[in-house]
Amino acid sequence: MRNLAAIIAFALLLPAFFEAVSAAAQTSEEGSIELVDPKVLRVCADPRNLPFSNEAGEGFENKIAALLARKLGKTLAYEYYPGATGFVRNTLNAHRCDVIMGMPQGDDLVQGTNPYYRTSYALVSKQGAGLEPIESLEDPRLQGKRIGIIAGTPPATNLAVNGLLENVKSYPLVVDTRFDAPAALMIGDLEGGRIDAALLWGPIAGYLAKHAKIPMKVTALVKETSGPRMIYRIGMGVRHSDQDWKRLLNKLIAENEAEIIKILASYGVPLLDENNALLAHQ
C-alpha cells in the first residue's frame, strides 16, 4: 500500500513537472530566438539629429539604412526616439526595431557589427584665422584661444592636460535633440567670432563646417599623445541574441563598402584609414 501511494503521488506530480519543464524550455527558446522582422528593415533612430538621422530621412544613417533595405528587398521603417538616456532600452531592447545605425565598436549596450567607417574628434577653425596648420591640442598656438567643447567628451581631458581650460566655452552633452542643437550653436558662435575654435565629434564637425556660412577648416585629431582616445570605429548595433542578423549585416557592410563610404564622404565625415590618414577622396 505504501508503494502504491507513492506511485499515485508521483503520477499526480508528473503533469506539474512536465509543465514546469516545458515552461523553462519555452523561456530558454524565446531567449535565443531572433525576433527580426522578415519583411521590414526596422531601424532605431533619433528624429532630429543631423547629420546622422531625422524624420525626413535626410541624414547619412538614413541613406545607409535605405541602401541596406534595397539590398535586403525589405521596406524601411523607423522607430524614432530622442538619442539620450534610455534610447537602447526603449527601442532595440523593447523589440520596436532591429538595428541601430552608428554605434561605436565596443559599446556593451548592444552587439556590434563589423565597423563600416573609422573617424575621430576634430578641431574646427575659420579659414584665414591662423589656426589652420594646427594638428594637435598640444600646439602652443592654441594658448589663450577661446575654444568650444561639448562637456564630458574626450577632448575636454586634453584641454585640461594642455592648460587650455581658462577660455573654454562649454556646451551640454545630453540634450533632447528635438529642442536643442549644441553643436550647431557652437559653430554659430565660431562664425560670429564668439569662439576661435570648436571641438566636435568628426561627423558633426565635417557636416556643420560644410554647411557653414564662411569657409571652415576641419582637422581630425589623430596626433594626440596623451588623454583618452580620439579615434573610433563605427558599426551598427543589434540585440545580443541576434547572431544570424549580425552576420547578415556584416555581409552587407562588406559587399557595399564603396557605396557606404561615398554616402559618408558626401556629408563631410572625416574618414580615416587604419594608419589614421584621411581617405584619398577627402
Regions found by a protein language model. Name each.
Residues 73-75, 93-102, 145-146, 186, ...:
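Alpha-to-beta junction loops
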Residues 27-108, 177-180, 266-267:
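Extracytoplasmic small-molecule ligand-binding "clamshell" domains
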Residues 13-22:
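C-terminal segment of classical bacterial N-terminal signal peptides
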